[in-house]
């Protein structure tokens, strides 16, 4: 199970690509980190 971390703008819409499942999300100021696990 690989983990992938994606950084996007806090208000940006993000959809996990096929084969990945979001497992956590954190905000830091204007940034948002989305943690994905390979399915």
Protein language model features and the residues they cover:
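Class I S-adenosyl-L-methionine-dependent methyltransferase catalytic core
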Residues: 1-39
């Amino acid at each position: 199970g690989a983990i992938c971390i994606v950084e996007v703008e806090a208000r940006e819409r993000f959809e996990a690509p096929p084969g990945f499942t979001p497992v956590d999300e954190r905000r830091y100021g204007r940034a948002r980190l989305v943690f994905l696990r390979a399915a």
